[in-house]
């Protein structure tokens, strides 16, 4: 039997980052499904599957990738990110003035909530985002956190019992207590794996960088093998230069 493949590109026509993200409908999500918001996971990888180069994702990126990320942030109610990623990437300004104004016009707060899970109480208050007066940060922990009173950002700490600060519990809390309908997870690899393992990811936005990285850096997902592996359904594909931008939906 001869296998056949469908050629997807190159395809004529260009779409701006805003139009691509608008097509996902993240900003139109209403209510919650199975007690949690709709979750989109944004990730970037080298051609050999590494999520970082020299400790961060910066060396893998492309201007179009960064534009897509900011548009995704513009669309959602909240961002979920691990403390390690907050530190490594030095989170600061999330959006520009135009994106904030577009959120306000849609009846949203100027910037999305940023939620992070710090089970051991290691809240990264040194990250520039904690010094942003307009930032709203939700911290979920299972230990005694450091003081956050000196942060310019609005920081709320939620302490769970041991083993309770799971991604699923955090998503449920964001939906029930903060009215969050859509979440963008920006990693890192351990958090992404936990979300996938818990069937808490609806959309995957994967940027594939035209690089071989090798080394011992993390893969896009890190942790124990998923048994069985989780299947995805390709929904869309875009290209900028030699970078590929793939949108997958979780298979049902």
Model regions and ranges:
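Enzymes that bind and transform nitrogen-containing heteroaromatic metabolites
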Residues: 1-252
